[in-house]
């Protein structure tokens, strides 16, 4: 008598979706960010095999665009930049940009290059340092990779600004 029964009873018909957009009819997510964080995880803990597997999984779920959030932060960078090395940045142990572009090409994806962040804007509020550095970064990256890989899709401007931004 009433034991073991849930009240009120739910019938199969009551479990229909109440979604505004019908299932499998919404906008698909086809792009994602590669969070290089060049002085932290994941890239220092992952080799090319792990990245390849990640790209395989992304491709399998419909990702066709990968965007590297930034190409470097302060003295850490994702590729061997002649310009940034002269400015005191550290030589990376792996050329992540080349690896990402090769994997993007292998899985028929487009890769977008996130610009360099010197950290000076965060220290001073003056954006002109970032603009000047990235003029050189863009030119050298295009020569090193843009002309070489069909997967190179363009640029991602990763800088953050506010009404108080100078420069």
State the predicted function of each range.
Residues 48-60, 64-118, 167:
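Aromatic-lined substrate-binding rim segments of carbohydrate-active enzymes
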Residues 35-48, 80-92, 122-132, 158-166:
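The substrate-binding groove and active-site-proximal loops of carbohydrate-active enzymes
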Residues 7-64, 69-72:
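Boundary/entry segment of secreted carbohydrate-active catalytic domains
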Residues 1-3:
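N-terminal Sec signal peptide cleavage junction
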Residues 33-36, 70, 113-117, 156-159:
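A cross-domain feature marking catalytic cores of carbohydrate-active enzymes
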Residues 116-122, 138-166:
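Active-site groove signature of glycoside hydrolases
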Residues 97, 131-142:
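Acidic, His- and aromatic-enriched active-site or binding-groove loops in soluble protein domains
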Residues 25-30, 62-64, 107-111, 149-153:
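Short, well-ordered coil/turn segments that N-cap beta-strands
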